[in-house]
Every structure is written in structure tokens, then in C-alpha cells.
Amino acid sequence: MRLKMYLAIRRAKKYMKEHNHPGRMIVTDKEIEEWRQRTRNMDRDCLTVEENLKKGLNIEKVELPNTSGWLISREGNPEDKVLYHIHGGGFINGCTKMAFFFLSHVVNKWGYNVFSVDYRLAPDHQCIDTITDCEDGYKYLLEHYKPENIILMGESAGGNLVLGLPHKLKDDGLPLPKGIISDSPVVQFVHYPYSYYENSCKTDFGIIFGINEAVLGIYQGDLPVDHPYLSPLCGDLSGYPPVYLDASNKESLRDEARMMYVRLKEEGCDVEYHELKDFFHAQMPNIKSHSTLKEQHPLILSFIHRMWGTNEK
């Protein structure tokens, strides 16, 4: 194991040297402004997506205290159940409109209605703002659904948030959802597990060395690095609802999901973990991928049906 770790570190350092990578993420003011502009452009470009997807779907914008959410439904789907989707994007970009293709697929093909929140993003907002927006979305759902009829679902940064949100709900005395679906989550920012050394700059060029420091620099705010809102792995996981976890064997965050699985098992939680072979990071929303539709989505649907006692279609 030590030899494999040593060789992985050497490979990563060689890649960084060849590509002029400093070995850590340096976030400049120029890059921050570029992120802001990119987010504005994505939001603008997705407006036509919203219009196209209105055909056959009911799309309702919901105003929340500091942001907004979207309820996407279809006639014939169970009216008493909802999947609460929290999008990914590294905490710095992404929006519901970008996820509409995936969400419309869920509503049309999975047969369940979806709510999604446009939480506030770094660098203009920090973790406490983001988790508060996610909680506000959940509070809205509690006005219309029983907690046992709500399942959280998210990928990457969203996978982190669906695991961190129950910590906030427990702190505030709110009922927990029926279940959690977390795809390729980052679960802590305390250290880099082995899969970073093994896969970063080899099979995963998206989640690379230094990303923790970059995210913490613009997203952490005043929270300690091991605060459960930021690092769900580090909190009290007792009493957590059933959890579905997955990650690719080839991604940097693989061991994050493994660690979360072990911690949840230690707490006696109902948890299942699926390691997907040769997948990309956070592949759940990619409905253009054959492997996503044929390998990953059936596993997720099986979990949903088990949670709600519904029949598989």
C-alpha cells in the first residue's frame, strides 16, 4: 500500500510539474469574476431549456426567504411524494435550469415529482448560507409533504449538501426525510484520502490536488473545517435516515464515499454503497450516458422503491 501511495504521489507531482500546476489551487480575483460571469451566462442560456421543457410538465417557481426553488411535476405521478434534488457544481456554479434535462427525465421516466433549490453560491456566499437555503427548501416541502414522503438527492457538491442538511435539521429540531441519495459526494475537507493520490491526474482530471484549499478559501466562511455542515462525515450520524451512496472506482472522491459508508454502518444506519466501474465523477445527471441509464439509475430507483414501498416500473 505504501509503495502504491508513493508511486501515485510521484505520478501526480510529475503531472503538476509538466502542466505548471502549483500543487494547490490559487484562486485569484480574476478567476472569481470569471466564475460569476460563467454562472450568469449559464443561467441565461438555460432559459430556453425551461421553455422547451414546459411541454407536458408542470413547472412552478417557488420563492424562498433568500433564493428560489422549482417544483417540477406531471399528472399521474404520486402527488404525496417528492424527490428533493440539490444540484452539484463545486459550490461555485450550477442551477436548477442546468439540471432540467435530468429532472424532467426523473419526472417523466422515474415517475416521481421533483423539487430543486437554487442555493446561494460561493464566492459571494459561504457554507452557512448554502445549507440555510437547502433547509428553507426543505421547510417549504414540509408544508406540503410528510417527511416520510421526501427523499433527498444530490451529486458532487449536492451529494455533500444532502448529507450535511440532516445535521442542520437535527440541530433545528426538524423531522428528517425518508432517505438520502448521494452520488459522488465530498464528505469532508480535513484531509485527502488515498483515492486522490491514486486517481487525481490519472483517471480524474476534475477533482485534483488543491481543490480542498480552493473550496475552503471561498466557501468555508467562519465554520471550522470539521463542522458537520461542511464535512458531514465529522458529525453525529446517529439517527440518520437510510442512505444510498455511490462513486466511481476511477474518481478522486471514491474513498470519501467509502469512508461515509463505514461511518454510517458504525452508527447502525441503513446504508448501501455501490462502486461504479469506470464511471466519471457525478454521472447521475448524465442521461445521455448508456451506463448511467442501464447501471446506475436502476440502483437508485431500487433504493427509492424500497424506501417508499412502491412498485418498480
Each predicted region: which residue ranges?
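Alpha/beta-hydrolase superfamily serine-hydrolase fold, recognizing
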Residues: 27, 60-70, 74-313
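A glycine/proline-hinged amphipathic helix-loop "lid/cap" segment
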Residues: 1-75, 309-313
